[in-house]
UniProtKB/Swiss-Prot annotation:
The gene is kmtR. Residues 44-67 bind DNA. One of its GO terms (molecular function) is DNA binding. Gene3D superfamilies: Winged helix-like DNA-binding domain superfamily/Winged helix DNA-binding domain. Represses expression of Rv2025c and its own expression. Acts by binding to the promoter regions. Changing C16S: No change in activity. Does not affect regulation by metal ions. Changing H110Q: No change in activity. Lack of regulation by metal ions. Binding to DNA is inhibited by nickel and cobalt ions. PROSITE patterns: HTH_ARSR_2. This is HTH-type transcriptional regulator KmtR. Residues 10-104 form the HTH arsR-type domain. Keywords: DNA-binding, Repressor, Transcription, Transcription regulation. It comes from Mycobacterium tuberculosis (strain ATCC 25618 / H37Rv).
Length: 130
């Protein structure tokens, strides 16, 4: 009936993995941890200070994120450093935060960042000209 009916359905096992990723994102502390790791690796103590939670609590969240393959570790002596698993996780976190900013009032913060409004204005001007 339709030439292009959209993407094929996802296999059940892949859907389960996607659901697990979203389940991990459904916790405010884990979102703060992932956001903190978007641009650099950090130790548990650094993350605990950054998100304002006790280190044992952050450590438990990190264990869940690691099991879900959203973060990975690197040991340096007795210190374990955490970072996002890959660029896809980083992009997922950034996109989720930016999408949430669009739900609020006014201009989203990421559009106000250095060059943000200018970039939006240039894109708009290009559309008007073209």
């Amino acid at each position: 009936m339709y030439a292009d009916s959209g993407p094929d359905p996802l296999p059940d096992d892949q859907v389960c993995l996607v659901v697990e990723v979203f389940r991990m994102l459904a916790d405010a502390t884990r979102v703060q941890v992932l956001w903190s790791l978007a641009d650099r690796e950090m130790s548990v103590n650094e993350l605990a200070e950054q998100v304002g939670k006790p280190a044992p609590s952050v450590s438990q969240h990190l264990a869940k994120l690691r099991m879900a393959r959203l973060v990975r570790t690197r040991r340096d002596g007795t210190t374990i450093f955490y970072r996002l698993e890959n660029e896809h996780v980083r992009q997922l976190v950034i996109d989720a935060v930016f999408n949430a900013e669009h739900a609020g009032p006014g201009i989203p913060r990421h559009h106000r960042a250095a060059g943000g409004l200018q970039s939006v204005a240039k894109a708009s001007a290009t559309k008007d000209v073209g």
